[in-house]
From Swiss-Prot:
Extracellular membrane side: 32-158
Annotated transmembrane regions: 159-179
Disulfide bonds: 52-128
UniProt name for this protein: Myelin protein zero-like protein 3
Organism: Bos taurus (Bovine)
Family: Belongs to the myelin P0 protein family.
One matching Pfam family: V-set
Glycosylation sites: 123
Length: 234
């Protein structure tokens, strides 16, 4: 009787361990990980992409669903703005009517959407929920959207970049022309000191030199104009 009782006691002792392993196994099998940007900044009138990606341990089927919700600032009320299940179902009511577009790909784990013609009234919290049965338990990440007007500083930086793109190539061309002029001038001085008599070909080169001088002066003048425009811009 004692020998028969030992195996039974061991079996009972293993029950809790097996139970823990079983539940851990279920957790791993049915895990669904979702990621989204915590903060997104956009500008009025410019399309904004809200990124959402997911990883599922199960194969993608037509049972997969995606839901995007919106919650205004300082409010507990949420509204559905997009639903996906084999097809796209953007909201047909509310402030986001006809402004939500699907830009994701479920087979690549992408559940992103885009907002067209955003305004500052769109500021708030957006949540992305994905279910891919049997993976239904997951986190629900939230994205804080901030929409603002493009400020003067942003516009100024664009103007500055454009000015640099125009100024630098012009400066390089002028420098190359000046170097070429300097080399030709040094060669002519050496020849004049040695009493070298110019041939008809060299006379033709001098004519070309005069043309190059005029071109160089014109380029220098253009560079000065660019410099003056650059200074007026800033």
């Amino acid at each position: 009787m004692q020998q028969s009782g030992v195996p039974g006691s061991r079996g009972c002792a293993l029950c809790p361990l097996l139970g823990v392993l079983f539940f851990q196994g279920v957790y791993v099998i049915f895990s669904l990980e979702i990621k989204a940007d915590a903060h997104v900044r956009g500008y009025v009138g410019e399309n904004i992409k809200l990124r959402c990606t997911f990883k599922s341990s199960s194969s993608i089927t037509d049972k997969l669903t995606i839901d995007w919700t919106y919650r205004p600032p300082s409010s507990s009320r949420t509204e559905s703005i997009f639903h996906y299940q084999s097809f796209q179902y953007p909201t047909t009511a509310g402030t986001f009517r006809d402004r939500i577009s699907w830009v994701g790909d479920v087979y690549k784990g992408d559940a992103s959407i885009s907002i067209s013609n955003p305004t500052m009234k769109d500021n708030g919290t957006f949540s992305c929920a994905v279910k891919n049965p049997p993976d239904v338990h997951h986190n629900i990440p939230a994205t804080e959207l901030t929409v603002t007007e493009r400020g003067f500083g942003t516009m100024l930086s664009s103007v500055a970049l454009l000015s640099i793109l125009v100024f630098i190539p012009s400066t390089v061309v002028v420098i190359l022309l000046l170097v070429r002029m300097g080399r030709k001038s040094a060669g002519l001085k050496k020849r004049s000191k040695s009493g070298y008599k110019k041939s008809s070909i060299e006379v033709s080169d001098d004519t070309d030199q005069e043309g190059d001088d005029c071109m160089a002066k014109l380029c220098v003048r253009c560079a000065e104009c660019v410099d003056s425009d650059y200074e007026e811009t800033y």
